[in-house]
Amino acid sequence: MQDKYHLTLEQNLYLAKRNLIDSIWRSAKIEGINVTFPQTYAIIEKAAVQNVSVEDILKITNLKHAWQILIQEPEAPLTLEWLCKIHGEVAKDEALEWGKLRTGEIGVGGTDYVPPIPNADAVRVFLQQMEQIPSPTERAIETMFRLIKQQIFWDGNKRTAMLAANHIMIANGCGLILVPEKEIETSQTVLLDYYNHDTLDNAKQFIYSTCIKGIDFPERKRTQGISL
């Protein structure tokens, strides 16, 4: 799986900042939070907003704070401690515990899959294994799906996993993972199939083919295509 983009860190951070509200809005939609883009913008800008629950406002605000960490610390190593730090923002005042690994059993809606109770050492080994994947884009996508399936936290696993994936993408200049609005329903189907049948390759290909966003430089491509 080849990287689609080769941006500088500065370029990728610019991309992340430009797409901050869109990223948060799409994550909210994936989680089933019924908010519009203008409502998301208003919440992030701390403006008054109507017809949005307090719980949903909290989730969006928490996502904003988590994204701020990604932008402020783009080259921080992806460790268990970092994941807990991000989750501490994502699920603050929402999950049973935030910033700590899950210690009890949970189920996954729409599937019979029951994730095992996580072990800190096993999570660390998993993250080290992911570092061996040469392509940062593939590493980001696979890390995201495996974290989602492991459900290492009580709640907010999908949001945390997507943030972890984008952290890898940003640090390596590979663009962003953003699920287009028209593909959100398909993404849920792909994820359920992965839960039930471990169809990781299919899930990875879906994200790779439809959900990678970057900055194109047409003039650069044209120049590179000229033989001297």
Regions found by a protein language model. Give the residues of each.
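FIC/Doc superfamily catalytic core
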Residues: 1-228
